Amino acid sequence: ITVDNGIASVDGVAAANAAGMRVWVTDHHLPGNELPAAECIINPNQPGCTFPSKNLAGVGVMFYLTLALRAELRKRGAFDGRSEPNLGSLLDLVALGTVADVVKLDDNNRRLVAQGLERIRAGKTWPGVAALLRIAGRDPRRASTYDLGFVLGPRLNAAGRIDDMSRGINCLLSDDPGAAARM
């Protein structure tokens, strides 16, 4: 499953298919003349897609995919007697990815960002986001789109350029505030 790429990877998907892999492409970039032969393509900008929000970032595409998967699992009874995953807990990450990807803030993206900032300001953010804000000397209770786009985004991008991008990912997804701060 790709995230935020793959719509132009005709040869890469063909190679993965030849190796016996099943490929799903999730992307928001504009497709070329030829689409990859993936088992599934989720992209609001592909021909024939009726999803109304065409300006999603890759993180937004993946967020809506997880919402759809949860709805399908609910319909199939997968949560009978069990609690459903709280996908709202991901909105701080969705907001960060949306702003850092510099996509157009249409009504849908504005809602995603506003809800994510609301969670951050309420102290309901992932430990990695809180750690990055703290290290940058920013007050989470006053978090803004500036913080997401010009304070956190560049720090995460720098991790990939200087060292290994997985450090930034691990920081964001860490459940341990101390470990997140050390990353």
Segments from the language model and where they lie:
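Alpha-helix capping and helix-loop boundary segments enriched in small/acidic/polar residues
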Residues: V3-I7, L30, C49-A57, G81-S83, ...
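Short alpha-helices
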Residues: P36-F79, L87-V94
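N-terminal small/polar loop signature for handling phosphorylated ligands or for N-terminal nucleophile
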Residues: I1-P36, I41-P44
